Regions:
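FAD-binding core/adjacent interface of flavoenzyme oxidoreductases
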Residues: 1-8, 62-140
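Beta1-alpha1 glycine-rich phosphate/pyrophosphate-binding loop at the start
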Residues: 2-75
């Protein structure tokens, strides 16, 4: 049995990325697994409503590159959300049926855009803005 702890961070956004940087800055040497339901690496959300729409080709929103995550020794699971947390077994179950074990679990999932009643009836020109795809849909 390994004495190196595994920290699983659920949520690959700004909070998840910040947690990784803080863990490593504070000399945490254990295993870190970052789990996100989006296919993108961690990125900043504030520019989604501004820069990404106005200057999509020039806007850099990525917080941690694939290389930086590798340098930090982080295993990344993308496009695969968590469907269940089993705190007794210390595991999370993913959408694809896989299970991931943890010693410590950090939930950094953020929020979701609230869809008002009858939202879909408003037509294809009404949007929510929560993720990169939402922002890209608004680019002229």
């Amino acid at each position: 049995m390994s004495n190196i702890e595994t920290v699983v961070i659920v949520g690959a956004g700004q909070a998840g990325a910040s947690a990784i940087l803080e863990l490593r800055a504070n000399k945490y040497e254990g295993k870190i697994i970052l789990v996100g339901d989006e296919t993108h690496l961690p990125y900043e959300r504030p520019p989604l409503s501004k820069d990404v729409i106005l200057n999509p080709a020039e806007t850099k929103i990525e917080i941690l590159s694939e290389q930086k995550l590798a340098d930090l020794g982080v295993e990344v699971i993308r496009g695969n959300g968590v469907v269940k947390i089993n705190s007794e077994a210390k595991t999370i179950d993913l959408q694809n049926g896989d299970s991931v074990a943890f010693d410590k679990l950090l939930l950094a999932t953020g929020g979701a855009a609230r869809r008002l009643p009858n939202f879909d009836a408003l037509g294809k020109h009404v949007y929510t803005l929560r993720n990169l795809e939402d922002s890209q849909a608004l680019v002229p």
